[in-house]
Amino acid sequence: AREQVFKTTTWGVIWIPISSGTSGVIREMAISRSDPNTLYATSGAAIYKSTDGGVTFASVTSGLPGRTITSVYVHPDSANVAVITFSGFGAGKVYKTTNGAASWINISGNLPDSPVNDVLIYYPGVATNVYYAAMDIGVFFTNDYGATWVELADGLPNTVAMHLDYHQATNRLRIG
């Protein structure tokens, strides 16, 4: 049962499995805001995509490094745009698709060789080219779709950043 996606329409009172499962434990999942039938789920180094609300999944892992995927984020305006991050060391920390995961582009740019734990597309109600990456060595941002990354150091402790959250109504970024 742990390899399945579950759904509730009763605020968590009743949960119904909606998928036949993946080949492993689901680590991360993201649902498109613009098309709720599109969702991505990760399992280890694999990523799967569903376009039928999670009933069926197809692997969209081709062309990606063989490391554990640590996060997936779908652009609020387009189910075809998603960004994923990887653990471990070596080239290729952040990848992006603009064609619904038919192909992936390495947008790691000049990121340091350290695991990336989370990613967020900054979206204050209009499309931007700003992304944030939470890493084992701090938080980095890009304003050119990943070509160059800059560390956010002012006022932040030198510590592991595991999670990013953006609240659009207050325009606040939270880091955990």
Regions from the PLM with identified roles:
Residues 1-176:
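Extracellular glycan-interacting surfaces
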